[in-house]
Amino acid sequence: LIFGLCAATIVCLLPSSPGYLTQQNSIAIEGVDNLLIRSLLDNNQFHDPLDEALNLGISSATWPLFGLLWPSGQHMAQRMAQRPVSVERILEIGCGLGLASLVAHRRGASVTASDCHPLAHAFLDENTRLNGLPPMAYCHGLWGKPALREDGLPVLTSARDAAPSGLFDLIMGSDILYERDDEGTLASFIHAHAASRSEIWVVDPNRGNRAAFHKQMAQLGFARHEQVLNHPAHKGIAAYKGRMLTYTRS
């Protein structure tokens, strides 16, 4: 298992820039060519002048998380690099920068990336352009949102992008079990968009919410396979511990 960052180039904020700092990195994924990925410089970035994120229930603290490269996302990208390309429809939920989707897209898979952040689509378009790829399908994917904004006012507006349409043979998501979901909104969202015969991939960095999600998925007819991920630090790449969760329904 090999992935990491190569030849990072910082893109400095200029007067004409959109109001946040970004960086560009060459991401190495074993078995496929490196990907150029533009991401936020760090988790201190914030720019929501029209309250688009605020109106979707995204707080200033969570605003930058979509635009960072996360270890779980790199593990998912590595998994996608090894999957044979077929005629299946693939949906990535909570895609953030969409690294796994970009790997699949470049290999010729039929993949749709989705996220709830108002800038995720723009970053995905920029990263497809940086890698000389044709446009990738994108949709707004939100499986639950708070009733109130960070400032206490009601969440009012809807997203600019359409919701996922049709059913998918493979649905994947990395680090999506980050909060309690007693009502099972994530499992219900997956169920609504999964084909009758489908596979679900979740990379989870041991967030602690797996047990409830397992139960919710089982109630929807999904069988589970769990693989322990325990990779020591290697050549500048941080150690990683988590689970690769595979749910199948046939």
Regions found by a protein language model. Name each.
Residues 3-250:
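S-adenosylmethionine-dependent methyltransferases
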